[in-house]
Amino acid sequence: MADKIRYGVTLYSYSNEYVNGILSFEEILRTVKAQGYTGIELVASQMVPGYPYPSDEWLAQLKALLEEIGLEPVCWSAYIDMGIRSDRDLTEDEIIQFTVNDLICAKKAGFPMVRTQHAISPKIFRKMIPFCKQLDMKLTIEMHHPHHPEVPVWKELIEIMRG
């Protein structure tokens, strides 16, 4: 049935099993499929070896494994580590570089969308549009407490999203 609702799950839901070695990454994917989910959100900083710079080989293996299992890669969740340096926060250019890197990695693994965090300012979000178009990728932003759609920064982000 073409209009049947499909269910996806964030692999963050399996954090305990993964972090404590109860299930391997592949076992989690197979469990997700066995539980009836069709799509996944991958929290890259948690489950991608070498993140934020995973190997092309690993990304290709992930894509092949998802195809083999029959899971749809829906969302690559990025993490902008503003504290990666001890002497300062990331610059605007560094945030852009990290975000472009996530878009490229997600694309290689077959994910059509990257979800990033609210460390992306409206100014940076606007600057990401050409990269998204070039890569044919979507960039979304996590709305996190205490934010909501009526917060001024979110009003501006939503306007950018509307084009």
Regions found by a protein language model. Give the residues of each.
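Hydrophobic faces of well-ordered beta-strands that scaffold small-molecule active sites
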Residues: 5-12, 40-42, 73-78, 114-116, ...
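Glycine-rich, proline-tolerant flexible connector loops at the mouths of alpha/beta enzymes
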Residues: 41-67
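Histidine-acidic metal/acid-base catalytic patches
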Residues: 1-38, 63, 67, 96, ...
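Glycine-rich anion/phosphate-binding loops
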Residues: 23-24, 52-60, 87-100
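Residue-level "edge-of-site" marker
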Residues: 45, 50, 78-79, 119, ...
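A short acidic, helix-capping loop that chelates divalent metal ions and anchors anionic groups
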Residues: 16-18, 46-50, 82-88
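Catalytic domains of carbohydrate-active enzymes, especially glycoside hydrolases
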Residues: 24-45, 104-112
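Active-site acidic/histidine proton-transfer and metal-coordination neighborhood
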Residues: 67-72, 83-163
